[in-house]
Amino acid sequence: RGLGDVYKRQIQKVEVFDTELYKDLIDYDALEAYRKRTLNPHTNPVTRGGAENDDIYFQGMEARNEHYAKVPAIVAEYMEKISEITGRHYAPFTYYGAPDAERIIIAMGSITETAHETIDALMAKGEKVGMIKVHLYRPFAPEYMLKVMPSTVKKIAVLDRTKEPGSIGEPLYLDIV
């Protein structure tokens, strides 16, 4: 039985913000233009890419890289705006723990809540530990991770949610190393 199975049976209080707070963050003209060009058999019945060979497909994928590389900065900008609106801190990576931590965990998802409590307990005993929470995984942006990592870190444990038999490491671990 995994954590997901445990969490799906829990009840938690959630504070939901009024969507009116976020209206200024949305470019409605761009959203409408996007909706008009998406594949929808009812409103925009078209076929795309049905005759691409490998070389053309690869060129198209490579052309996207320029735009894909811009995503972390755009997401970080919007996270900052949402932080201002809500009064909560949002960022691609956040750090919790001792400012002079020597050992840290890097993780994402539900395990971070348990790790948070463990870090509190270890820091109460005088240990220099911390955790980096991953909030933006793809595209992975190490520059944002390094911004929050204490310069005193000597050891890193990566807790991944995936187990890939036969692999030299799991996806998050491979991104970190």
Where are the language model's segments positioned?
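Thiamine diphosphate
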Residues: 1, 5, 76-177
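Conformationally flexible catalytic loops at phosphate/diphosphate-handling active centers
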Residues: 5-95
